[in-house]
A protein has these predicted regions:
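Walker A/P-loop
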Residues: 2-36, 65-66, 95, 99
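Short loop/turn elements that form and flank the Walker-type P-loop nucleotide-binding site
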Residues: 2-4, 27-28, 46, 54, ...
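The Walker A (P-loop) glycine that initiates the GxxxxGKT/S ATP-binding motif of P-loop NTPases
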Residues: 10, 47, 78
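AAA+/P-loop NTPase substrate/partner-engagement loops
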Residues: 26-56, 63, 83, 152
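AAA+/SF3 P-loop NTPase mechanochemical coupling elements
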Residues: 67-71, 89-92, 107-126, 176-179, ...
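Conserved C-terminal "switch" segment of AAA+ ATPases
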Residues: 68, 128-138, 142-204, 209-223
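Conserved catalytic/switch belt of AAA+ P-loop NTPases
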Residues: 76-116, 138
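C-terminal engagement/docking regions of AAA+ P-loop ATPases
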Residues: 197, 201-267
Length: 267
C-alpha cells in the first residue's frame, strides 16, 4: 500500500519543516528539502530537454542525487507559493510526482528515462491552502499546525532556542543567564506571532550583545544575567503593549475580542 502525501499547513515559524526533519530521523532515512517558493517554470520540476543550452535535470532528480538513496524523506517547502506563466504550470507537473499511481514511472525531460519515486516519502508545507490548485490539494492529506501558546513558546525557548543560540555564539551556559521573568517578558512584549521566529531573533540578539560584553571583560568567570529590569538594554523599548482593562466604565465604550493568526487580542 502507498503512504499518504502529508501537507503541513500553518503560519510561518510553527515548525513544519522541523517536523519533516524529525520524521526522517525517526525513520532512519535521508532528508532532502526543495524550496518551491516563486517557481513558475514547469522545467524546474520536470527538467529541461537536452536540446536547450544549459539544460539540466529538474529539482526532483537533483534532490534524489543529493540524497544518494531511493527512499529519502523529501520536503517540498512552500508549495502554496508556486506560480505559473508561459513556461508552464509547475503545480500541474507536481501532480505526477505526488500521485502514487504515476510516480513509479516519473520521467525527467533531461534524463528521458522513467524513474521510480514510489519509495520516496513526500512531505509538503504551506502557509495556506487557498492558493493550492484543487487537483493537487486532493492528492495530499492536510494537517493543520496551530500557533503556539505563550507557555509552549516558553518551554521551546528554554529547551531548544536558548541552548542553540548559546552554542552558535560560542557562549558557555554558565556565562549567560536569562531569567524566567525576562523570557516571559520577551514573549509577551517583544513578539507577536504564531511561531517562534521573532522569539529566536530576540534571543540571538541578546546572545550577540552578551558575547561582546564577555569579550570586553576578558574573564572566563564573568557571568551576565538578563532580567526584566535590564532587558531593555539588550532589546530596546518593548514592541507590544499588553492590553489593560478599562479602569472605569464609559458610556458607549465596549471591549471587543479579536482573533488573528498571531493569537487573540483585545480591541
Amino acid at each position: 500500500q502507498y503512504g499518504s502525501i502529508l501537507l503541513f499547513v500553518g503560519a510561518p515559524g510553527t515548525g513544519k519543516t522541523s517536523i519533516g526533519q524529525s520524521i526522517a530521523r525517526a525513520l532512519g532515512r535521508k532528508y532532502v528539502r526543495i524550496s518551491l517558493g516563486g517557481i513558475r517554470d514547469e522545467a524546474e520540476i520536470r527538467g529541461h530537454r537536452r536540446t536547450y543550452v544549459g539544460a539540466m535535470p529538474g529539482r526532483i532528480m537533483e534532490a534524489m542525487k543529493r540524497s544518494g538513496v531511493s527512499n529519502p524523506v523529501m520536503v517540498l517547502d512552500e508549495v502554496d507559493k508556486l506560480a505559473k506563466d508561459y513556461g508552464g504550470d509547475p503545480a500541474s507537473a507536481l501532480l505526477e510526482v505526488l500521485d502514487p499511481e504515476q510516480n513509479s514511472t516519473f520521467t525527467d525531460h533531461y534524463m528521458n528515462v522513467p524513474y521510480d519515486l514510489s519509495n520516496v516519502l513526500f512531505v509538503c508545507t504551506a502557509n495556506t491552502t487557498d492558493t493550492i490548485p484543487e487537483p493537487l490539494l486532493n492528492r495530499m492529506e492536510a494537517i493543520s499546525f496551530p500557533g503556539y501558546t505563550a507557555v509552549e513558546k516558553y518551554h521551546i525557548a528554554k529547551k531548544h532556542l536558548i541552548p542553540k543560540a548559546l552554542e552558535t555564539m560560542g557562549i558557555q551556559k554558565r556565562m549567560l543567564k536569562i531569567t524566567d521573568g525576562a523570557l516571559r517578558q520577551i514573549i509577551e512584549e517583544y513578539t507577536m506571532e504564531s511561531g517562534v521566529r521573532d522569539l529566536k531573533k530576540c534571543i540571538e540578539t541578546i546572545c550577540r550583545s552578551a558575547a561582546v560584553e564577555l569579550v570586553k571583560k576578558e574573564s572566563e568567570r564573568s557571568v551576565i544575567s538578563v532580567t526584566k529590569s535590564n532587558l531593555s538594554d539588550y532589546l530596546g523599548r518593548k514592541q507590544i503593549h499588553p492590553e489593560q482593562k478599562l479602569s472605569s466604565k464609559a458610556p458607549g465604550v465596549v471591549t471587543g475580542l479579536a482573533w488573528t493568526r498571531a493569537g487573540g487580542a483585545i480591541l
